[in-house]
């Protein structure tokens, strides 16, 4: 049976985990790291780079490097590379493909199923886009799980007693707070709230703005207008933020950041932790509203919370820990989990639940936002309240607003505002063919059905005629099946091209190594080899070197040269063995001719020791 993995598809970093012997294991990537940067780049050669290699070349390839694409999920955002448009789903699929490849290399078997996590406050469109990204990457997404829920699953499953857990999840691009109750294998989400546009990227941006202002004040040059300089500033900002988590100050030093009238200019400034916290106070304040909202919605007092779990790399910032402590009235948050890995571990556990590898665990999640339709006057009429446990199904009867109305348009939205237009539209469809009737008479049953992934299905049915119309809400970013199929083919094509490039590089490396070892062997053993063998081998070495000098040499051409050199190299070995055997035979014959009488004496002694004189031999030993 193919293995299922748990994937935390993050804004800045992603993690993949798997169950081994019932225990979750985080899988290290091909580079040996347990987290993979969610960065995708297109090299000038057309190769797709993902992860650390993409991040490293970002400064020299700014326009073709994409990061933090998670912030665009569920929107109509596009990026153009070589006159080709890429959606957020496709970019995310490249990251997922790498995680899939690394997991397969670790496990030694195919990975087909995955549980992928999303922020609890992700809308329907964002969840749908995440599922599509998985499909494009060649994964069957068996479940979309909220990140805080996965974290609670990983943290609380083995604790035994009933407990109330609050998960404070501040990642690279999103923020969630969730309140959960765990007991006897049941993980139940009571309430959730958050901000899909608040995360570590925003803290980085404040440092970048501060650096740009400092440099402009000192040198009169605006670095924000220089793409390459801006990229260097972003990398330095992220590094400074991390350093300020453990140090009270850091020096940001960027030599040759740009050129001025008098020559090259350098950036060097000290940033203290207190100054950094002053720059980002308002960002911290934005975490307080969702925190209070969750406690209110869950009907739980601070004193009733047993544990607070910090999730996401951004919770390592001391100011974040302090604000959580302040919100909890001085209570220390739990630091017993790895904030970068706990979500993927929870996702792997949920994958195990779905595969039947983990028994007696039930995950009850909630919908983060209310769902409803537009009714007369543009009012938002809610059918499913936020924080309703999913999966769920609700129906209500509506009627027409005009006499003899032939059709009704069902306009669906997600949000908490009173007027439909102020909420996030999810989609609309029309129920046609209604029989003529005075207004208020027709009975139209509208049903909302939310599945375990949090994806919404809506049905409208006229009770008189039995006519029915339905749709799966998929938001503005939704891709049609044909588009997804096309993107899957493109992703496979990129994977094939990348595999060919990797094969070509490996073949080239193998050839260069063979040339080096053969030349070394020739130099060290030149006097022991016959001239005809040396000439043939040197000719093959030179021919392979000429092939390797051509940048456009195909793997087949290189392989042919390697095969030919391999065959002629074998002749060197054969010649060496033949020479060694001849020397050995000559040495044996010479010894036999000159030492025959001595040999007879020695033979007699050996026979004597091994036969009659055993006692003497024993004594001598």
Curated annotation (Swiss-Prot):
Q: Which residues carry this modification: Phosphothreonine?
A: 174
Summarize induction of expression: By stress conditions e.g. heat shock.
The UniProt record lists the keyword NAD: no
* Molecular function via GO: ATP binding; ATP-dependent protein folding chaperone; unfolded protein binding
Q: Where is this region: Disordered?
A: 580-621
| The protein's name in its UniProt record | Chaperone protein DnaK
Q: Where is the composition biased (Acidic residues)?
A: 596-621
Q: Which UniProt keywords apply?
A: ATP-binding, Chaperone, Nucleotide-binding, Phosphoprotein, Stress response
What is the role of this chain? Acts as a chaperone.
| Family of this protein | Belongs to the heat shock protein 70 family.
Protein's organism: Nocardioides sp. (strain ATCC BAA-499 / JS614)
| Pfam families given in the database record | HSP70
The record's InterPro entries line, in alphabetical order, gives: ATPase_NBD, Chaperone_DnaK, Heat_shock_70_CS, HSP70_C_sf, HSP70_peptide-bd_sf, Hsp_70_fam
